[in-house]
From Swiss-Prot:
Belongs to the IspH family. Homodimer. This is 4-hydroxy-3-methylbut-2-enyl diphosphate reductase, chloroplastic. Pfam families: LYTB (PF02401). Keywords: 4Fe-4S, Chloroplast, Iron, Iron-sulfur, Metal-binding, Oxidoreductase, Plastid, Transit peptide. The lineage of its organism: Eukaryota, Viridiplantae, Streptophyta, Embryophyta, Tracheophyta. It is an enzyme of class 1 (oxidoreductase). (2E)-4-hydroxy-3-methylbut-2-enyl diphosphate binds at residues 150, 239, 310, 377-379, 439.
């Protein structure tokens, strides 16, 4: 799903602010008050809520979690919903592979499965809680603020369960369509502060499936904010997770890759790193969609902390952190580094495990690689990137429907280019490496492999 993001306004009560004291039962006894109206942030620009010095996002989130209209743990239907998910998303083929050391032969196709692949616990948890919400509220209107995960199969299943996306008109989410008593699911990527405020104001039941690893990153940028450090966020500025993370930050800049990080660090050093940066005006034009409101590179790059979108390449995040640390040492001296740099480990374990398994897989003797996952999945794109860098023929597809008759395939490269190829499966016996993104059910991988087996069976019949 492609969404054009822009700064957008939504009419919301403006008397929200820092919390009153809590009762001994843990429920909110006061109201939240805020002096200034705010706008919902739908782009790289910061929201006025986040920029409001009177507003404490951490306090707001803490009190939201304690409110009676908020749930992030499910509704007591875990066993039942996991059984349903098991029937819909598991795979006999994947089970056979796991039972045989992640390698098995079907006809003239040998399949090698990565050691870590597919659904991570955070994704499984998010989907399970969403299923529980439908069970708990069978008649209520249920909305979701974004795709729950980046997988078309799972998102379609939720649509079939009458979980509806909040409509978007010209880049603006139509929150006014949500009525008191409706249920609203926050996806695994989380939701921005302004969206949470809007929903809280409308007195709806919030079901929060945000991955705890994402929440961990929010805690990190809140620490940066408290210490008056600018958060340098390694991520994609239009990605749902990064939008949410930035809403909890104070001052921030989002860098997509090492090249952009080098540009920022070169600017800090006055062009003495690699000469890639230029004027302040050029800097602001380059990052106009990826910085907080009022960002000034001459003022806000004196103290910096590192955070990341949890699905980015682990190694690149680490290298960016080291680069910024070295830059601050060069600029301000080793003895003063703690006054100018903070680093926290916000790399998701599941992302790291899948990337490590992929690095191991590409060292195996395989003829080609199948990377299965949603085409808008950031973590899946990086698995494809690892294979491409190794020079292995690799095909990133989101479902078996991308494999057509006559040995044709439509797939994406890691940077998003769509490619169509004929005769992609070599003749004769082949060894296929397989992995899948953290949002991909095993059943989707099974359907892909069945298509491959069918094509190779047709080939064998033609030879015979």
């Amino acid at each position: 799903m492609s969404i054009t993001f822009q700064l957008c306004r939504i009419p919301i009560r403006t008397d929200l602010a820092l919390a009153e004291p809590l009762s001994v039962t843990g429920t909110v006894t006061g109201t939240l008050r805020c002096r200034k109206p705010f706008v919902i942030r739908c782009s790289g620009e910061s929201s006025s809520t986040a920029a409001d010095s009177d507003f404490d996002a951490k306090v707001f989130r803490k009190n939201l979690v304690r409110s009676k209209n908020y749930n992030r743990k499910g509704f007591g239907h875990k066993e039942e919903t996991l059984q349903l998910m098991d029937s819909e998303y598991t795979s006999d083929i994947i089970k056979t592979l796991k039972d045989n050391g992640n390698e098995y032969r079907w006809g003239n196709v040998t399949v090698k499965l990565a050691e870590a692949y597919g659904f991570c616990w955070g994704v499984e948890r998010a989907v399970q809680i969403a299923y529980e919400a439908r069970k708990q509220f069978p008649e209520e209107k249920i909305w979701i603020t974004n795709e729950i995960i980046h997988n078309p199969t799972v998102n379609k299943r939720l649509e079939e369960m009458k979980v509806e996306n909040i409509p978007i008109d010209e880049g603006r989410k139509q929150f006014e369509i949500v009525n008191k008593g409706d249920v609203v699911i926050l996806p695994a990527f989380g939701a921005g502060v302004d969206e949470m405020l809007a929903l809280s104001d409308r007195n709806v039941q919030i079901v929060d499936t945000t991955c705890p690893w994402v929440s961990k990153v929010w805690n990190t940028v809140e620490k940066h904010k408290k210490g008056e450090y600018t958060s340098i966020i390694h991520g994609k500025y239009a990605h749902e997770e990064t939008i949410a993370t930035a809403s909890f930050a104070g001052t921030y800049i989002i860098v997509k890759n090492m090249k952009e990080a080098m540009y920022v660090c070169d600017y800090i050093l006055g062009g003495q790193l690699d000469g890639s940066s230029s004027t302040r005006e050029e800097f602001m034009e380059k990052f106009k969609n990826a910085v907080s409101k009022g960002f000034d590179p001459d003022k806000h790059l004196v103290k910096a902390g590192i955070a990341n979108q949890t699905t980015m390449l682990k190694g690149e995040t680490e290298e960016i952190g080291k680069l910024v640390e070295r830059t601050m040492m060069q600029k301000y001296g080793v003895e003063n580094i703690n006054e100018h740099f903070q680093s926290f480990n916000t790399i998701c374990d599941a992302t790291q495990e899948r990337q490590d398994a992929m690095y191991k897989m590409v060292e195996e003797r395989i003829d080609l690689m199948l990377v299965v996952g949603g085409w808008n999945s950031s973590n899946t794109s990086h698995l494809q990137e690892i294979a491409e860098e190794r020079g292995i023929p690799s095909y990133w597809i989101d479902s078996e429907q991308r494999i057509g008759p006559g040995n044709k395939i439509a797939y994406k490269l890691n940077h998003g280019e769509l490619v169509e190829k004929e005769n992609w499966l070599p003749e004769g016996p082949i060894t296929v490496g397989v992995t899948s993104g953290a949002s991909t059910p095993d059943k989707v991988v099974e359907d892909v492999l069945i298509k491959v087996f069918d094509l190779k069976s047709e080939e064998a019949l033609q030879v015979a």
